[in-house]
A protein has these predicted regions:
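DNA major-groove recognition helix of helix-turn-helix/homeodomain DNA-binding modules
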Residues: 49-64
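Short, charged recognition helix plus adjacent turn
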Residues: 67-73
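A short, Lys/Arg-rich alpha-helix, primarily the initiator
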Residues: 1-17
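Alpha-helical residues within the helix-turn-helix
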Residues: 15-16, 27, 56
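Short, basic-rich loop-to-helix N-cap that marks the start of a DNA-contacting helix
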Residues: 43-53, 72
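Short alpha-helical DNA-recognition segment
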Residues: 19-38
Length: 73
């Protein structure tokens, strides 16, 4: 079975939305700035609810924020 790696466009989306800071996004979705940092770096996979909250904060579909990269092991 292939290992799935979740990638994201959060940093790009933040900059496309008036250079929103990590803290501003964190406040909008109800988490800490450190959580946003970890998600952006790929060190933390958000819950489904948080993933949708982030997409809603940018007013984009979920697949524009998060996507899966397949890696063959």
């Amino acid at each position: 079975m292939e290992k799935l790696t979740i990638q994201n466009n959060i940093r790009r989306l933040r900059f496309d939305h008036d250079e929103m800071t990590q803290q501003q996004l964190a406040d909008k979705v109800g988490v800490t700035r450190q959580t946003i940092v970890a998600i952006e770096k790929g060190n933390y996979s958000p819950s489904l609810e948080l993933a949708f909250r982030i997409a809603l904060a940018f007013n984009v579909p979920l697949h524009e924020v998060f996507f899966v990269e397949e890696r063959h092991s």
